[in-house]
């Protein structure tokens, strides 16, 4: 029998439309483990921030805030398993994500992280972005998108206004990313490959669920390459296909909601956790 802590994500770090789904995937994983006789203590991200942390060998970690992640850091040094590792969660914060992916030759669009107060006409980093009328994406540069206005589409001519909107909301950094043409695919995975699903975003999970016209093998390879680089064990994200055999990573996140495949994903994550704990004993 194993005692473990399930740490639920703060609602402030979940996109509004996914808050119940984020809770549900951890609930489902916990249910599979407790059905095997494991004993759970459920805590919130706020509990972790305030230092209320039971000592157990395993922590299922859905925290995304920097303070909670920093408080979880010492646990691995003490021999506990933390899934996902707090370092991997922090790697998914946009400013770190861009640096990690761009520096390791992962197929990823040209992206610059700048102060939201920067002036597009004179900023040397923004000057590296194209000025040919193509679409640009402006994303909050600290943590993940929490609401629709955290990711906006614009062009070079509208960039100053888009960035000013982030400044007005007291978001100090933005990531400005070149648009990648082609269909967008959403993917979900578990580190050892026992679970990997994807579907075209424009078709929905019940539509073109496997996107057969796109190169699934290269998609899978790219997703796992990025997850391994960041240290993620439970992950999901988005890829664009400018060509059917050329996936480009747009985004990757720690422990997504897995909403279209929740039951199968919860079972797979629980199985992965059991095997991880068995391997260390």
Show the residue positions of the predicted features:
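Generic preference for hydrophobic
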Residues: 82, 111, 137-138, 176, ...
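A short beta-strand motif that forms the metal-chelation/ATP-contact edge
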Residues: 56-60, 139, 187-189, 245-260
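Phosphate-binding site of ATP-dependent enzymes
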Residues: 150-230
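Short glycine-rich anion-binding loops that position phosphate/pyrophosphate groups of nucleotides
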Residues: 64-66, 141-143, 255
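Active-site nucleotide/adenylate-binding loops and adjacent lid/helix of ATP-dependent enzymes
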Residues: 2-10, 79, 87-174, 181-182
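A short glycine-rich, hydrophobically flanked beta-strand micro-motif that places a catalytic Asp/Glu
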Residues: 42-45, 185, 232-244
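C-terminal active-site "lid" helix and adjoining low-complexity regulatory extension at the edge
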Residues: 29, 228, 242-281
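Conserved N-proximal alpha/beta basic substrate-recognition cap immediately N-terminal to
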Residues: 6-119
């Amino acid at each position: 029998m194993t005692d473990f802590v399930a740490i639920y994500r703060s609602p402030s770090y979940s996109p509004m439309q996914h808050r119940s789904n984020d809770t549900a995937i951890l609930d489902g994983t916990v249910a599979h483990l407790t059905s095997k006789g494991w004993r759970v203590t459920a805590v919130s991200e706020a509990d972790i921030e305030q230092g209320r942390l039971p000592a157990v060998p395993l922590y299922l970690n859905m925290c995304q805030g920097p303070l909670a992640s920093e408080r979880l850091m010492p646990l691995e040094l003490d021999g506990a398993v933390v899934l996902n590792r707090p370092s991997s969660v922090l790697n998914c914060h946009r400013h770190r994500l861009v640096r990690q992916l761009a520096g390791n030759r992962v197929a990823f669009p040209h992206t610059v992280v700048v102060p939201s107060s920067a002036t597009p006409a004179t900023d040397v980093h923004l000057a590296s972005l194209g000025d040919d009328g193509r679409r640009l994406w402006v994303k909050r540069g600290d943590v993940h998108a929490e609401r629709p206005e955290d990711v906006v589409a614009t062009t070079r001519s509208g960039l100053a206004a888009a960035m000013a909107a982030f400044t007005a909301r007291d978001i100090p950094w933005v990531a400005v990313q070149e648009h990648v043409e082609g269909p967008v695919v959403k993917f979900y995975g578990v580190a050892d490959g026992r679970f990997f699903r994807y579907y075209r975003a424009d078709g929905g999970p019940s539509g073109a669920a496997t996107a057969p016209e796109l190169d699934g093998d290269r998609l899978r390879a790219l997703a796992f390459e990025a997850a391994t680089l960041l240290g993620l064990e439970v992950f999901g994200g988005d890829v664009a296909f400018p060509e059917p055999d050329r996936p480009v990573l747009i985004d990757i996140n720690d422990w997504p909601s897995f909403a279209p495949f929740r039951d199968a994903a919860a079972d797979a994550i629980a199985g992965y956790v059991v095997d991880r704990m068995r391997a260390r004993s």
